[in-house]
Amino acid sequence: MKIHEYQGKEILRKFGVAVPRGKPAFSVDEAVKVAEELGGPVWVVKAQIHAGGRGKGGGVKVAKTIEQVREYANQILGMQLVTHQTGPEGQKVNRLLIEEGADIKQELYVSLVVDRVSQKIVLMGSSEGGMDIEEVAEKHPELIHKVIVEPSTGLLDAQADDLAAKIGVPAASIPQARTILQGLYKAFWETDASLAEINPLNVSGDGKVTALDAKFNFDSNALFRHPEIVAYRDLDEEDPAEIEASKFDLAYISLDGNIGCLVNGAGLAMATMDTIKLFGGEPANFLDVGGGATTEKVTEAFKLMLKNPGLKAILVNIFGGIMRCDVIAEGVIAGSKAVNLNVPLVVRMKGTNEDLGKKMLADSGLPIISADSMEEAAQKVVAAAAGK
């Protein structure tokens, strides 16, 4: 789950991290009111969407008068903001963050992630803040410094001070940076975040260290422990299909391809998508119906996939362990009839009640293309999507 910048800053503030004064605004008049409350002489008008690169897309403006605040708020609110993370369709801006201006002398980067290679929590820092860290990692990996943080001890003073010095924090400002880094770690750990990022971390001309941006991603599996985080959820920023899928306990993620995938088990779902790509196809979605799929869930899964206007074919790939193949077959038949399926459907089933499931599909009278292996299924669905 993602949240907005202003919400991330609210979290940081709770953990002792210095952030600029600011408030969200949902209308032009509200933006002006917030600016007047903050006082001048400089304000920053920032689009709030769940994507980076807002400044380059025209979603961040510096205003030097109240009238400019009004002008920029009017420009940004309601715009379809396109960044390198939104795709060409962009994301509609429904809210703003109005913030006091900052004296920017030095822009740094810090973040916390779970590193899958070392299986550790890693604090990363760089002197190259204010830009895409992926670009820095690719072109200048030597500028990214890493510290492994042990949960049993937390981020130690010496670790924080060492990283701060390496990324260029002046010696006199290192105690402030330490407070921010340790606060960021505590926020990351205590909220079950999967990412906590400050970009940029600013050092002003007088040596004051503040977080000018905040980005958090949270582990959705841990949200039951954090109702205060769930309250930050903005459904306008999420894929409607994914929201609908969650109502039926379906793990669904929209992708850019044209081949729908309905699979049981996340590992098999990823392997299925990889195999489709191996044979030249492009998956339209990740869809895991889980081990307790019912006819209703399978029908809803078909409905979700068919809402994609670019869908050309569907592959159902089931391994019947806990989930019986005859139950899936029943759901496939009912789902196909309920939605008047009009795209080619390839089904591959292996495992419990496999023969019964295949017989049910064969006797259904539906134009289902059967396959015995994942390789065969992928080849057939790629060919079907291409109209062959």
From Swiss-Prot:
It comes from the Bacteria. Substrate binds at residues 264, 321-323. It comes from Burkholderia vietnamiensis (strain G4 / LMG 22486). ATP binds at residues 46, 53-55, 99, 102, 107. This is Succinate--CoA ligase [ADP-forming] subunit beta. It holds the Pfam family Ligase_CoA. Keywords: ATP-binding, Ligase, Magnesium, Metal-binding, Nucleotide-binding, Tricarboxylic acid cycle. GO terms for biological process: succinyl-CoA metabolic process; tricarboxylic acid cycle. Residues 9-244 form the ATP-grasp domain. PROSITE patterns: ATP_GRASP, SUCCINYL_COA_LIG_3. Its EC number is 6.2.1.5.
